[in-house]
Each structure stands twice: as C-alpha cells, then as structure tokens.
Regions:
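Formylglycine-dependent sulfatase
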Residues: 21-367
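N-terminal secretory signal peptides that target proteins for export/translocation
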Residues: 1-3
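Bacterial N-terminal signal peptides
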Residues: 7-19
Length: 367
C-alpha cells in the first residue's frame, strides 16, 4: 500500500481511539493473571471438563484471542509480560535467571508500572510475584502498593495445609505474606486467594478516582492443589487421584468466583465503563493436570515447561465497554511482550527509550 493511505489510516485510527477513550483520557487498567491455567481450562475456550461462567461472561463481553503465547514457565513469562522484552534481552531465560534482571543503572529494565506512573497512574501488584523477588520487590519496580506471598501453591498456612497436602509436605513459605514491605503472618482462618481479593477490592475503592493500574496476579491454580473453602469433605472410598482431580476443579471454580466478584466490585464502584480488563494465563497447564485439559475430547500437546504448543498457548481476552466488540474472536498471533506497549498506548504513555521493546500494541486488535 502507498505511504499516503497508510498515514491517513493511522491518523483516522488515532482519532477513533481518542474518541473511544472519551473525555476521561486516562482509562483504568485491570490486568488479571491466572497461575498455571492452560488454554483448554476455560469454558469459553471449549473446555470439556471445567465450567467458568464468570470468566466466560467477561470474555464474551470483549475480544478473545485463540493464538496468544507466552513463555512456558512462571518467572520468564512474568518477566516477558512486565518488560515487553524477550528473555535473550532481559536475561530471564530460566526461573533462576529471573533473579538477575537488572534493576538499576544504564542497563536497568523498565516495567509496566514505571511506564504508567509517568502519566499519573496509581499502581498496585497484588498476588504472586514469585521468581522475580530476588531482583527486587514490586515496590522497587514501580508499584505504589503491593501484597505478595511466597507460598508457591500452599494457600493456607502450614498448620492448616500440612494435613491436607500429599505426604504432609509444606512447600515455600505459606505462613507469611508481605504487605508494602511489612511481613505479616497468615492466620489459621485466612485463605490466601480471599486475602488477595480483599486487598484488591480495598485498593480499588481507595483509588476509584483513577487512573489506576491493578496487576492482580492470582494464586489459582498453581499446585500443590489443596481444598478451597468451598470444597466438599472427603468422600468415602474416594481415591487419591479422584480427590486431586476434584480439588483441582474446585480451585478453578473458586478462581472463577473471585474474578466474578472483582468485576462486580468494579460495577459497584461505577468503574467498569472506563476500565480495560485483560485476563491471561501465565503458562500452560501443569503436567499433572494437562491430560484432563481437553477440547472436544482432544488435548493440546505439551504442558507447563514444554516448548510444545500447550506450554505457551494461554487464555487471553480483553474487554472494555464501548471499545471492544462483544463476542469477537481474534485468531491473530500475539504474545506477552505486547502487553507493555498495549497498556502504554491505552494510557497515552511514551514507550521506554534506549532499548528494544519487542512487543507491539494490541489496541487495534481490540476493535
């Protein structure tokens, strides 16, 4: 196509985007990241086994992607998301390598909250920070507020979790979480996903004047899979495998419930109309759960940690009332590096300079 028509189209699109955003030139952004949730584990993606009515309704209100990819492991995926740069640039090529991401000096990486804060956004990270911790806590990467935990799949404290877990094993540090730099003990009656949700909704209430960026890094559905507060008691004669599968389903159902409650809170606060919500999984299904993650009786080859399709293909959708058409399915290829430039365009923020940003804004794909 000749250059002149391209320039005209670009100008028209920019004008359309400005009018869609409206008088409130800085929309809010809520980014929901599910842990170890593979593409076939949502009802809207055709899951045979799992029912996710709240997430499905949210997906159907916007644009759902069917070929969205990320790194197949938690740490590298989250580094890719937050920096918009591939691992060979950031150094986050493995879980352990994530601790070496450079935070200060000329070669420092720049993350999404740093970009958005420059144009007036309040920023919060609530949930799993994981392998990025050695490189600095969320507050050191531009988040005004953070609540993160170190339980790695143990969502009750060790006293409560030990009798529930296989072999009585307790992983990570489920007994504490960190709230704005202060380490706090998890009480016996506290369920980490509920604690995260409570903090997220309180933060939304406090920052409803906007604009804000909430990175809601959910704990579900990372293993070890333990009962949720809604799980039924053990069934007589139930095998360990059957119990594990039932509890995994319970965890997906509970995650779906929390997403529904978060959206309801945005509605209650009258924030939904001016908020872009993006939902995504951080990598494919965990190996133990991948065989049950089928669509039409077939599984996607590969799982978390694998370079096959199922390792990096993840659920992804975006919804923004008045901007994203309801029920649209997008089959274009996109990946997690696209989030930083997408959020920057939505916020009207310049991209970081002096570095290569591998991602490209998806805003035009949301139409």
């Amino acid at each position: 196509m000749p250059l002149r028509p391209l320039l005209v189209l670009s100008a028209v699109f920019s004008a359309c985007l400005s009018s869609l955003i409206g008088a409130n030139a800085k929309p809010n952004i809520v980014y929901i990241l599910a842990d170890d949730l593979g593409f076939p584990e949502l009802g809207c993606n055709g899951s045979d086994r799992y029912k996710t009515p709240n997430i499905d309704a949210l997906a159907n209100s916007g644009v759902r992607f069917t070929r969205f990819y990320t790194a197949p492991l938690c740490g590298p995926s989250r580094a890719l998301i937050l920096t918009g740069r591939y691992a060979f640039r950031s150094g986050a090529v493995t879980q352990d390598a994530c601790k070496t991401i450079i935070r200060t000096g000329e070669k420092a990486e720049v993350m999404i909250p740093n970009v958005l804060k420059k144009v007036g956004y309040a920023t919060a990270m609530i949930g799993k920070w994981g392998q990025l911790s050695p490189s600095g806590d969320p507050s050191q990467w531009g988040f005004d507020h953070d609540l993160h935990f170190k339980g790695s799949g143990m969502y009750w404290n060790s006293k409560v979790a030990k009798p529930m877990s296989e072999g009585g094993e307790v992983r990570g540090d489920p007994d504490t979480y960190v709230l704005d730099g202060k380490t706090i003990k998890v009480k016996d009656d506290e369920y980490i996903p509920d604690l995260l949700h409570k903090d997220a909704t309180a933060w939304l209430e406090a920052h409803k004047a906007g604009p804000f960026f909430l990175y809601y890094s959910m704990s579900h559905v990372h293993g070890e899979i333990l009962p949720t507060p809604d799980s039924a008691p053990a069934q007589k004669g139930e095998s360990e495998d059957a119990k594990r599968k039932r509890h995994y389903t319970d965890n997906i159902v509970y995650m779906d419930k929390l997403v529904g409650k978060l959206v309801a809170e945005l509605d209650r606060l009258k924030l939904r109309e001016n908020t872009l919500i993006v939902f995504m999984g951080d990598n494919g299904s965990a190996k133990a759960n991948a065989p049950d993650a089928t669509i039409g009786g077939k599984r996607i080859e590969g799982e978390k940690g694998s370079m096959k399709e199922g390792g990096g293909l993840v659920p992804f959708f975006a919804t923004w009332p008045g901007v994203t058409p309801a029920g649209k399915v997008n089959a274009n290829v996109a990946d997690a590096s696209d989030l930083l430039p997408t959020f920057a365009e939505v916020a009207g923020a310049p991209l970081p300079t002096g570095r290569v940003i591998d991602g490209r804004s998806l805003v035009s794909q949301f139409k």
